[in-house]
Amino acid sequence: MANIDKDKLKAIEMAMGQIEKQFGKGSVMKLGEQGAPQMDAVSTGCLDLDIALGIGGVPKGRIIEIYGPESSGKTTVALHVVAEAQKLGGAAAYIDAEHALDPVYAKRLGVNIDDLVVSQPDTGEQALEITEALVRSGAIDVLVVDSVAALVPRAEIEGEMGDSHVGLQARLMSQALRKLTGTINKSNCVVIFINQLREKVGIMFGNPETTPGGRALKFYASVRMDIRRIDSIKQGDGITGNRTRVKIVKNKVAPPFKQAEFDIMYNEGISKEGNIVDVGVKENIVQKSGAWFSYGDIRLGQGRENAKQYLKENPAVALDIENQIREKYSLPLAKAVESTSVEENTEESVES
């Protein structure tokens, strides 16, 4: 403020004082007084995606949109974010508007389903009111709305099957997001909206794909992720998973348009070990010679699947490689997962 006139400074201070009297302390401030604010993030459970997002995960206090075709992995990515938040002692909520949440699959991904707050609302208005109440509580760290396309306005549910309801859902989303944005920021909660894809009719040039729910979500979302299945992972004759690509089409907290590729294995979720191998090779931390993968003097295996299996059986080596990658990108270091509860359970089953 050195270049500002003293009279102007005095006038600003007086105006700020009046605003604080009227609206309360903290309603107006100088940005520099707070120091450089650190952008907190919740990991996605996928190393390459954390790197692509630029801050090590999805930003807290912001709205996130994940969209893509059917069976592309949208819910899987959202559930991994929930699991990562719970691992750090956070609370999570899931608004299941599609009435399709599989608790068995969620548990396999690492979600603590006993503590997960779940709601299966009847209407879009009800879903968004529940969302607002949970966010306003200040106790929820991650909230997932699955999905925007399933948020059906009350008028549509109460009306006849063939009735026209033009723009109802878009108006509902616009009104809800206007109310939610400030509350989400104050409560430091990550709100993830899962969305589907639709096609515009009669588009000759350009991309005909669009997302339902109007334009409001596109504006209010700080991060938008476009998720696509690009290949099938085969083992023998069977298909065991999908190769998935995520493009960060909008990012208000880091440079956008970065991409991440990873494996989503059936009944397992995102393959952490596969991701460590891929990023390790890309960053020359894991060496690839022909079909062999090695890390320093340690031979990880012949072929990618064998290297993945070695890292699964040797979590200390996997953690070491992961933390070297994280250091390179200035991301928070990963900690060793405590396996005591698993060991206790196996001991109990052996004794019984």
Curated annotation (Swiss-Prot):
Alphabetical keyword list: ATP-binding, Cytoplasm, DNA damage, DNA recombination, DNA repair, DNA-binding, Nucleotide-binding, SOS response
InterPro entries according to UniProt: AAA+_ATPase, DNA_recomb/repair_RecA, DNA_recomb/repair_RecA_CS, P-loop_NTPase, RecA-like_C, RecA-like_N, RecA_ATP-bd, RecA_C_sf
A biological-process GO annotation: SOS response
Organism whose genome encodes this protein: Clostridium perfringens (strain 13 / Type A)
GO CC annotation, single: cytosol
Localization in the cell: Cytoplasm
Gene for this chain: recA
Family: Belongs to the RecA family.
Classification via PROSITE patterns: RECA_1, RECA_2, RECA_3
PANTHER family hit by this protein: MITOCHONDRIAL DNA REPAIR PROTEIN RECA HOMOLOG-RELATED, RECA
Function: Can catalyze the hydrolysis of ATP in the presence of single-stranded DNA, the ATP-dependent uptake of single-stranded DNA by duplex DNA, and the ATP-dependent hybridization of homologous single-stranded DNAs. It interacts with LexA causing its activation and leading to its autocatalytic cleavage.
One Gene Ontology molecular-function label: single-stranded DNA binding
Descriptive protein name: Protein RecA
